[in-house]
């Protein structure tokens, strides 16, 4: 069947001879539609309901076919609210999957799951569209080169470095700083690497989406005066959206990123906040489609759905997609099927700790729980590897001694253990860092610390050269020279108080 390029609906192609059906049943966001015999739409085809409700308001709902039920009926999931729909309304089969605009015209704009701009800046001037359901790159096209992606955040670059073109998970419960860390990464990467980013807001708070947009405009990541010079495209399917939209918005963002990689041959950063909400939406849809729930009430197709998204995030010989995904951990339980399934796909994990956050150490990245497949001497070099291992050993010994300290006090420790504890506390504080995106709240200017500077700083602490400096001097500073300067300032303040 031929497609009509002059579609009245952005990102969705319609066919010359309309294939129409009628709504048979509506259960929340799920529609059953009856089509004429022999005219059933394919799985993943987009269906459109265009009508008027009882108050004579325009209805324009796009759905996606999920199941073929028999008796010429299909079951589809709506991408927007189904308010006003009634049985018997006409449904048009577009003859194609959902397609979204791609290319340079998407930068600086905010889209919904259908690829429609929602920022009141007018239509998107893009002739190119891609379907959101695409195959993962063929094995022969993949690029297997290993290299580090420098973020400018000390704890990440030293202890759990990110792979260029890899997948990174940010794990943490509610309110420990996942979204702030993502905003800092977007800021640092846009400024230090000049990379193009795509941000997929999957099932998170609308307020956070708005805050992120405003923050990006302030920092220049989105250029209001010349929108084409922006470094990021935003795709939002927030908490108030139906589960169908939240389940597919990650694919919309990924499709836009794939265009930059495959056609523009660029290195792209794909941020997904939050991948757990993608699983959660899939769970809601699965129940509505009548599938039997699996472990902890999740959908039986959890691994398949996650795999179909994650396998498309890959580096090819044309370009790369480096993906950073925030993962909400329900009740801080890392064995929950949603975070556990996500773990299998990741090259690095950045685990955020509530204990560190309660101490006021930000970013609250747990240095012992965070891991990376890149932390090997043949990839990062011996100096980096040995420094990271010594930092971890010192922090691990401090963790083991904490029970003894709590019961008997520091005085009962050996001289060597006391020294280890003192250095570990300095390391713990030096792993904190002022963020550019938090300047407004803290009043401290943000700091970007290069990898070489980070390694030098921790080597100086481990060597004992800075044993004479107070712990507080290492808290919320950039490189090690700032810690030395802060120590002098603290000493002068103490003298003036006396």
From Swiss-Prot:
Superkingdom of origin:
Eukaryota
Q: Name one GO biological process term.
A: proton motive force-driven mitochondrial ATP synthesis
Stated membrane topology is: Peripheral membrane protein
Could you say which EC number(s) this protein's record lists?
7.1.2.2
- Main localization of the protein? plastid
Q: Where does ATP bind?
A: 172-179
Classification via SUPFAM superfamilies: C-terminal domain of alpha and beta subunits of F1 ATP synthase, N-terminal domain of alpha and beta subunits of F1 ATP synthase, P-loop containing nucleoside triphosphate hydrolases
* One term under GO cellular component: proton-transporting ATP synthase complex
Q: Where in the cell is it found?
A: Plastid, Chloroplast thylakoid membrane
Keyword Magnesium applies: no
Q: Which reaction does it catalyse?
A: ATP + H2O + 4 H(+)(in) = ADP + phosphate + 5 H(+)(out)
What's in the keyword line of the UniProt record? ATP synthesis, ATP-binding, CF(1), Chloroplast, Hydrogen ion transport, Ion transport, Membrane, Nucleotide-binding, Plastid, Thylakoid, Translocase, Transport
Any one GO MF annotation of this record: ATP binding
Q: Which CDD domains match?
A: ATP-synt_F1_beta_C, ATP-synt_F1_beta_N, F1-ATPase_beta_CD
On assembly, the entry states: F-type ATPases have 2 components, CF(1) - the catalytic core - and CF(0) - the membrane proton channel. CF(1) has five subunits: alpha(3), beta(3), gamma(1), delta(1), epsilon(1). CF(0) has four main subunits: a(1), b(1), b'(1) and c(9-12).
| Family named by the database record | Belongs to the ATPase alpha/beta chains family.
Biological role: Produces ATP from ADP in the presence of a proton gradient across the membrane. The catalytic sites are hosted primarily by the beta subunits.
> HAMAP family attached here?
ATP_synth_beta_bact
Listed name of the protein = ATP synthase subunit beta, chloroplastic
Per the UniProt entry, what species is this protein from, by scientific name? Agrostis stolonifera (Creeping bentgrass)
């Amino acid at each position: 069947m031929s497609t009509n390029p002059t579609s009245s609906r952005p990102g969705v192609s319609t066919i010359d001879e309309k294939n129409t059906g009628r709504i048979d049943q509506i259960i929340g966001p799920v529609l059953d539609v009856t089509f004429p015999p022999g005219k059933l739409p394919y799985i993943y085809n987009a269906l459109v309901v265009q009508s008027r409700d009882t108050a004579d308001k325009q209805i324009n709902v796009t759905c996606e076919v999920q199941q073929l039920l028999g008796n010429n009926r299909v079951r589809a999931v709506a991408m927007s609210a189904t308010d006003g729909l009634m049985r018997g309304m006409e449904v048009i089969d577009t003859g194609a999957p959902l397609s979204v605009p791609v290319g340079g015209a998407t930068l600086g704009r905010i889209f919904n799951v259908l690829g429609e701009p929602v920022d009141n800046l007018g239509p998107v001037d893009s002739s190119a569209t891609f379907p959101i359901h695409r195959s993962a790159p063929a094995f022969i096209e993949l690029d297997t080169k290993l290299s580090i992606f420098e973020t400018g955040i000390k704890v990440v670059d030293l202890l759990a470095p990110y792979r260029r073109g890899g997948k990174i998970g940010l794990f943490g419960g509610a309110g420990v700083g996942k979204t702030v860390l993502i905003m800092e990464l977007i800021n640092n990467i846009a400024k230090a690497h000049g990379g193009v980013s795509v941000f997929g807001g999957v099932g998170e708070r609308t307020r956070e989406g708005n805050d992120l947009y405003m923050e990006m405009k302030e920092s220049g990541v989105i250029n209001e005066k010349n929108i084409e010079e922006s470094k990021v495209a935003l795709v939002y399917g927030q908490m108030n959206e139906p589960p169908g939209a939240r389940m597919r918005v990650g694919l919309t963002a990924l499709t836009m990123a794939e265009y930059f990689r495959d056609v523009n041959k660029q290195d792209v950063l794909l941020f997904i906040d939050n991948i757990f909400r993608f699983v959660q939406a899939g769970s809601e849809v699965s129940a509505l489609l009548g599938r039997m729930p699996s472990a902890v009430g999740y959908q039986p197709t959890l691994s398949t759905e996650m795999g179909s998204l994650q396998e498309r995030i890959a580096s090819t010989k044309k370009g790369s997609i480096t993906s950073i995904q925030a993962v909400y951990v329900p009740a801080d339980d890392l064995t929950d099927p949603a975070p556990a399934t996500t773990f299998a796909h990741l090259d690095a994990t950045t685990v955020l700790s509530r204990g560190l956050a309660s101490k006021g150490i930000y970013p609250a990245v747990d240095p012992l729980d965070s891991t990376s497949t890149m932390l090997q001497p043949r990839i990062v070099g011996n100096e980096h590897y040995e420094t990271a291992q010594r930092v971890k050993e010192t922090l691990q010994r401090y963790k083991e001694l904490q029970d003894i300290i709590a019961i008997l006090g520091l005085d009962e420790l050996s001289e060597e253990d006391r020294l280890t504890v003192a250095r570990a506390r300095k390391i713990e504080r030096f792993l904190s860092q002022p963020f550019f995106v938090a300047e407004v709240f803290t009043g401290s200017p943000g700091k970007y610390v290069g990898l070489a500077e980070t390694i030098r700083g921790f080597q100086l602490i481990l060597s004992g050269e800075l044993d004479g400096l107070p712990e507080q001097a290492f808290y919320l500073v950039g490189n090690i020279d700032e810690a030395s300067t802060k120590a002098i300032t603290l000493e002068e303040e103490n003298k003036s108080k006396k």
